[in-house]
């Protein structure tokens, strides 16, 4: 898997955290960069840790399902993407600012938004992805989007929340399709056919 593909997956995964971060930003009367950094660290940290755990889990079964690994990757990415699109209909639940940025609240929400990343880690094991650069990229990307989410939520409210989750879902579904089509030779067949016409 190329660095560009990993970045695309990282962006797709981070949209869930981005949407929640917007809600957190909405609860602030005044922008707090401390809270934005804290949110980014929690969300980015969990989002990096969960794929690593998923990868370690996936390596235990990799040898048994090599022949269908592309179907599993396609299925997991598509299901996560569809779920993100469904969740885009949920609206922000506004709570007190102190509660919103408490360690308990941040831990619970960071864990909840990173469960999908656990499944992504399993697909990384099947696709033999270099896991350390992958989780580093996911963590940094999620930190960035979470930080921006708090800022955007504080400035504009929930305007971008649902759109972010829809975009994230579509990205993950698209990557799942690409992995499947790559393995089935559909993409190379299309390019070969186009080259013949040229």
Curated annotation (Swiss-Prot):
Any one GO molecular function term: manganese ion transmembrane transporter activity
One cellular component (GO) term of this entry: plasma membrane
InterPro entries reported in the protein's UniProt record: Mntp/YtaF, Put_MntP
Membrane-related topology note: Multi-pass membrane protein
Positions of transmembrane segments: 3-23, 37-57, 65-85, 105-127, 131-153, 171-191
Compartment annotation: Cell membrane
Main location, first listed in the record: membrane
Protein keywords: Cell membrane, Ion transport, Manganese, Membrane, Transmembrane, Transmembrane helix, Transport
Task performed by this protein: Probably functions as a manganese efflux pump.
HAMAP family: MntP_pump
Similarity field: Belongs to the MntP (TC 9.B.29) family.
The protein, known as: Putative manganese efflux pump MntP
Species of origin: Acetivibrio thermocellus (strain ATCC 27405 / DSM 1237 / JCM 9322 / NBRC 103400 / NCIMB 10682 / NRRL B-4536 / VPI 7372)
Taxonomy of the source species: Bacteria, Bacillati, Bacillota, Clostridia, Eubacteriales
């Amino acid at each position: 898997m190329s660095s560009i593909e990993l970045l695309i997956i990282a962006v797709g995964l981070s949209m869930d955290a981005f949407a929640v971060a917007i809600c957190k930003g909405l609860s602030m009367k005044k922008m707090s960069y401390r809270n934005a950094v804290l949110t980014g660290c929690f969300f980015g940290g969990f989002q990096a840790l969960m794929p690593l755990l998923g990868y370690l889990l996936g390596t235990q079964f990799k040898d048994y399902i090599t022949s269908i690994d592309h179907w599993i990757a396609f299925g997991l990415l598509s299901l996560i993407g569809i779920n993100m699109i469904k969740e885009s209909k949920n609206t922000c639940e506004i709570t007190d600012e102190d509660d919103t940025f408490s360690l308990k609240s941040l831990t619970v929400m960071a864990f909840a938004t990173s469960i999908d990343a656990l499944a992504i880690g399993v697909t990384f094991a099947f696709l033999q992805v270099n896991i350390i650069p992958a989780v580093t990229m996911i963590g940094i990307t999620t930190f960035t989007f979470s930080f921006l989410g708090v800022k955007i939520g504080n400035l504009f409210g929930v305007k971008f929340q649902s759109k972010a989750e829809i975009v994230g879902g579509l990205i993950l579904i698209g990557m799942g399709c690409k992995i499947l089509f790559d393995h089935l030779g559909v993409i190379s067949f299309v390019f070969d056919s186009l080259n013949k016409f040229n």
